[in-house]
């Protein structure tokens, strides 16, 4: 798919894309209780989660209603994923808790991602692995209710272990510092507690005392990280937008912190009663921000930094190298295509903002990374541009291009 973008000014109201992080967690909750998700958007990552719980015995009706099995067991000995890192990393400890043997594989982008920390951890507790990368055969059953794991590679392992210890009727997790993307662990803890469980997270330890979980019927709330590209598009293009279907921002740093970050850079950016109000200003300020706890915000911040006055610095970026693409290099390349300079350091990237009228009109290959396409499309709204392999947005937000059209973006889709 090729998308041609012409100079446009974004305006209007848009519904935030459903949070795939929340959708995947809700789908995995169907291992324990009945879940009915209204109007579920079937992104590639969500489909990976659906196929995973189906392989563990969950009955799935119309890709929206999920009924837990009477007994959890591995129904399929081979689980093939597409590209969902969240699903993969949560699935590994879950199948280890259920016990048995299963082989997991995925597309090349996911095969490149490291699994070292979860393999190291679970190998100490009765689990055998064929390797530390995909394809991966997992054999055995967790022999302990008290798990130690390094927290530097991915928070998704810890989220998966919270599910695993619910399967085992309780236990504890000790996370060896540093703890990366802590906000996503807090999301999992909050979700279980909201459904009736008893999960405590203090310092670097999590204690799980399961209770019967309540059923859920409703729609998946919006995703601040994905919605931020609509905000970025409005700010870059000189427009305004209102984004609805968003939960109130939490106090801890996470994807929702983008509301405050954009405001600190000079934009009108306010949350009120489930709506995020965004309006462009004539100029924006540079910023220094650590995104280790919310790495998915990197490209939105980089996009606005490209046209901000001065030099911005995004730190805590080390794990961006193991996303759908090497996102540090992707940010550098995309900014360079638009004529924006940047400098990569060991754990940070400097972005040298320019006047937006000086932005180029390049052709951008999205590198099979949905966020590359979204960042580039926002910058292209100033002087135009072309996105190739633009179908990559289907990984998280299949409606992205249609949403831009509804916000008055001038684009053609080939």
Curated annotation (Swiss-Prot):
<feature type="binding site">
    <location>
        <position position="296"/>
    </location>
    <ligand>
        <name>3-phosphoshikimate</name>
    </ligand>
</feature>
<keyword id="KW-0808">Transferase</keyword>
<protein>
    <recommendedName>
        <fullName>3-phosphoshikimate 1-carboxyvinyltransferase</fullName>
        <ecNumber>2.5.1.19</ecNumber>
    </recommendedName>
</protein>
<feature type="binding site">
    <location>
        <position position="154"/>
    </location>
    <ligand>
        <name>3-phosphoshikimate</name>
    </ligand>
</feature>
<comment type="subunit">
    <text>Monomer.</text>
</comment>
<comment type="pathway">
    <text>Metabolic intermediate biosynthesis; chorismate biosynthesis.</text>
</comment>
<dbReference type="GO" id="GO:0008652">
    <property type="term" value="P:amino acid biosynthetic process"/>
</dbReference>
<dbReference type="Pfam" id="PF00275">
    <property type="entry name" value="EPSP_synthase"/>
</dbReference>
<keyword id="KW-0963">Cytoplasm</keyword>
<feature type="binding site">
    <location>
        <position position="85"/>
    </location>
    <ligand>
        <name>phosphoenolpyruvate</name>
    </ligand>
</feature>
<comment type="similarity">
    <text>Belongs to the EPSP synthase family.</text>
</comment>
<keyword id="KW-0028">Amino-acid biosynthesis</keyword>
<dbReference type="InterPro" id="IPR013792">
    <property type="entry name" value="RNA3'P_cycl/enolpyr_Trfase_a/b"/>
</dbReference>
<dbReference type="GO" id="GO:0009073">
    <property type="term" value="P:aromatic amino acid family biosynthetic process"/>
</dbReference>
<dbReference type="InterPro" id="IPR023193">
    <property type="entry name" value="EPSP_synthase_CS"/>
</dbReference>
<feature type="binding site">
    <location>
        <position position="371"/>
    </location>
    <ligand>
        <name>phosphoenolpyruvate</name>
    </ligand>
</feature>
<feature type="binding site">
    <location>
        <position position="25"/>
    </location>
    <ligand>
        <name>3-phosphoshikimate</name>
    </ligand>
</feature>
<keyword id="KW-0057">Aromatic amino acid biosynthesis</keyword>
<feature type="binding site">
    <location>
        <position position="155"/>
    </location>
    <ligand>
        <name>3-phosphoshikimate</name>
    </ligand>
</feature>
<dbReference type="InterPro" id="IPR006264">
    <property type="entry name" value="EPSP_synthase"/>
</dbReference>
<feature type="active site" description="Proton acceptor">
    <location>
        <position position="296"/>
    </location>
</feature>
<feature type="binding site">
    <location>
        <position position="395"/>
    </location>
    <ligand>
        <name>phosphoenolpyruvate</name>
    </ligand>
</feature>
<dbReference type="InterPro" id="IPR036968">
    <property type="entry name" value="Enolpyruvate_Tfrase_sf"/>
</dbReference>
<dbReference type="InterPro" id="IPR001986">
    <property type="entry name" value="Enolpyruvate_Tfrase_dom"/>
</dbReference>
<feature type="binding site">
    <location>
        <position position="181"/>
    </location>
    <ligand>
        <name>3-phosphoshikimate</name>
    </ligand>
</feature>
<feature type="binding site">
    <location>
        <position position="327"/>
    </location>
    <ligand>
        <name>phosphoenolpyruvate</name>
    </ligand>
</feature>
<feature type="binding site">
    <location>
        <position position="20"/>
    </location>
    <ligand>
        <name>phosphoenolpyruvate</name>
    </ligand>
</feature>
<dbReference type="GO" id="GO:0003866">
    <property type="term" value="F:3-phosphoshikimate 1-carboxyvinyltransferase activity"/>
</dbReference>
<feature type="binding site">
    <location>
        <position position="20"/>
    </location>
    <ligand>
        <name>3-phosphoshikimate</name>
    </ligand>
</feature>
<feature type="binding site">
    <location>
        <position position="156"/>
    </location>
    <ligand>
        <name>phosphoenolpyruvate</name>
    </ligand>
</feature>
<dbReference type="GO" id="GO:0005737">
    <property type="term" value="C:cytoplasm"/>
</dbReference>
<feature type="binding site">
    <location>
        <position position="323"/>
    </location>
    <ligand>
        <name>3-phosphoshikimate</name>
    </ligand>
</feature>
<feature type="binding site">
    <location>
        <position position="156"/>
    </location>
    <ligand>
        <name>3-phosphoshikimate</name>
    </ligand>
</feature>
<feature type="binding site">
    <location>
        <position position="21"/>
    </location>
    <ligand>
        <name>3-phosphoshikimate</name>
    </ligand>
</feature>
<dbReference type="GO" id="GO:0009423">
    <property type="term" value="P:chorismate biosynthetic process"/>
</dbReference>
<feature type="binding site">
    <location>
        <position position="113"/>
    </location>
    <ligand>
        <name>phosphoenolpyruvate</name>
    </ligand>
</feature>
<comment type="function">
    <text>Catalyzes the transfer of the enolpyruvyl moiety of phosphoenolpyruvate (PEP) to the 5-hydroxyl of shikimate-3-phosphate (S3P) to produce enolpyruvyl shikimate-3-phosphate and inorganic phosphate.</text>
</comment>
């Amino acid at each position: 798919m090729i998308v041609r973008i012409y100079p446009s000014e974004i305006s209007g109201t848009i519904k935030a894309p459903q949070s795939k992080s929340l959708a995947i967690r809700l789908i995995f909750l169907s291992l324990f209780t009945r879940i009915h998700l209204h109007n579920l958007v079937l992104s590639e990552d969500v489909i990976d989660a659906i196929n995973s719980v189906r392989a563990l015995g969950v009955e799935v009706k119309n890709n929206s209603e999920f009924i837990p099995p009477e007994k959890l067991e591995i129904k399929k000995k081979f689980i093939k994923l597409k590209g969902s890192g969240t699903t993969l990393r949560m699935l590994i400890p879950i199948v280890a808790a259920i016990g048995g043997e299963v082989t997991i594989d995925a597309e090349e982008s996911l095969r490149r991602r490291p699994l070292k920390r979860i393999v190291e951890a679970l190998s100490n507790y009765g689990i055998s692995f064929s390797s530390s990368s995909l394809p991966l055969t997992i054999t055995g059953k967790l022999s302990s209710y008290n798990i130690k794991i390094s927290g530097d590679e991915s928070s998704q392992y810890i989220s998966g272990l919270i599910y695993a210890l619910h399967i085992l009727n309780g236990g504890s997790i000790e996370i060896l510092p540093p703890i990366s993307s802590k906000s996503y662990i807090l999301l999992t803890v909050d979700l279980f507690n909201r459904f009736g469980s008893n999960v405590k997270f203090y310092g670097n330890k999590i204690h799980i005392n399961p209770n019967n979980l309540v059923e859920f019927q409703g729609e998946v709330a919006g995703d601040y990280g994905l919605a931020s590209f609509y905000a970025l598009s409005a700010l870059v293009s000189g427009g305004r937008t209102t984004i609805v279907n968003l939960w109130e921002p939490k106090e801890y740093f996470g994807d929702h912190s983008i509301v405050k970050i954009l405001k600190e850079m000079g934009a009108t950016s306010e949350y009120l009663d489930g709506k995020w109000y965004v309006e462009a200003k004539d100029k924006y300020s540079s910023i220094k921000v650590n995104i280790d706890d919310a790495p998915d915000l990197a490209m939105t911040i980089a996009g606005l930094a490209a046209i901000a006055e001065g030099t911005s610095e995004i730190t805590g970026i080390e794990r961006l190298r193991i996303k759908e693409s090497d996102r540090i290099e992707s940010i550098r390349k995309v900014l360079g295509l638009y004529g924006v300079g940047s400098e990569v350091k060991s754990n940070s990237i400097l972005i040298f903002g320019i006047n937006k009228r000086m932005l180029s009109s390049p052709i951008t290959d999205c590198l099979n990374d949905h966020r590359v396409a979204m960042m580039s499309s926002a910058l292209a709204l100033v002087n135009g541009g072309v996105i190739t392999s633009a179908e990559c947005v289907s990984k998280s937000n299949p409606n992205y291009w249609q949403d831009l059209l509804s916000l008055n973006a001038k684009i053609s889709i080939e």
